């Protein structure tokens, strides 16, 4: 069992639970706009939080079981980063999320 992670707003996650699928790519961008959902390994979460979510309120860290994800997951290189990041190429089925933990972003 392998886990990947995604930082989500509480509002976006609540909408996903109602709809049965999560369709936000990253903060302020939808899956339709970006083409995939950004995810991270456990080691990558702090850098993502620091870079994109600094000071953001009402966040959750979604713990995603890769064995349960319906769409394709591709590990892709990001310029300037040593390790590739997992990208989910389609709506994330909420049944793949095994935990939605309260998450505090770094202060601004």
Can you say where each PLM-predicted feature lies in the sequence?
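Conserved, structured core segments of small domains
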Residues: 1-108
């Amino acid at each position: 069992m392998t886990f990947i992670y995604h930082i989500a707003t509480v509002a976006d996650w609540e909408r996903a639970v109602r709809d049965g699928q999560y369709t936000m790519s990253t903060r302020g961008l939808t899956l339709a706009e970006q083409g995939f959902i950004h995810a991270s390994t456990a080691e990558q979460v702090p850098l993502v939080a620091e870079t994109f979510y600094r000071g953001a309120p009402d966040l959750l860290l979604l713990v995603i079981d890769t064995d349960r994800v319906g769409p394709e997951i591709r590990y892709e290189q990001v310029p300037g980063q040593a390790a590739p990041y997992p990208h989910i190429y389609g709506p994330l089925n909420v049944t793949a999320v095994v935990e939605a933990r309260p998450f505090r972003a770094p202060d601004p």
